[in-house]
Amino acid sequence: MADNIKYRFIQNVGDYFPSGYFNDDFFDKVQKCAGVSKDEVSDICRPYVRLKQEYNDYKNFIINDRPRVEDAIKHTHDFHTRLLSILGYATDHAYQEHCIVNDETSPVEMIPVRHVIRQGGQVKMFVMEMQNLITIDDKEPAGLFEQQYDSDERSGQQKYAARQWRFVFNLDTEKYEISPAIINKAITHIFLLPEERRPHFILMLAGNTVFLFDKDKWAKGSYLQFSLDDLFAQASIDQKHRTHYALFHMLVCKQTLAAEGEMVLMDTIIEESYKNAY
């Protein structure tokens, strides 16, 4: 895993960006690709300064109120709504369309997707959610490779029953079942779908953590992982560090990953990263 202490909030897992590109002037490179001016950087950062307090309130609720799983999921979903809005994504009509994995089974196998973003008839991107990854009393929650949407009660793995998501989406269990239930396996399955149904990117929101998965890099074990705790901490140091908000935004906003009728900016950034890696 190639990380950079200057951008501690980003984990460049499996060299999503070549380590020679993900260095101390990474922000300048991304800003140049995005064509964003200094004044525009300031405008991008402003909503995140306000979001910090909302994030702290949300995190305090999770840690101090010890909510039921279903209430924690709902509060996490609501925080995600605020974050997605700042990132430029439409946030209404969540979970209106399932990702159907196998419609020849009974019940039909599906994966819950918060938002499906298309251009024409082509799926471009999924926005998905999982439970938060906030540590409570030094107890690590189930992560990307353990957490499940639903599970066999006899399994030794941590249980994430679909009923616990009932405040976010309702699942007709006679018609549908969540399969694959383990989240990283669900991601793999999505990236093996037929091309017209396969997203280029998946933005996975997990409360204090954001993941970006790419169909061209997932099989190689490469993805980006963002810590909101580290983002807010680093960006609050001084005015210079506040630009970390803009870097986060430029990497995962809708304009970068799913702009309408334009070349995907992230593809441009990745292309530049290989040209200038060494």
Predicted regions and their residues:
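Acidic-basic catalytic patches of nuclease active cores, encompassing PD-(D/E)XK
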Residues: 59-99
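Active-site metal-binding core of divalent-cation-utilizing nuclease and nuclease-like domains
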Residues: 82-123
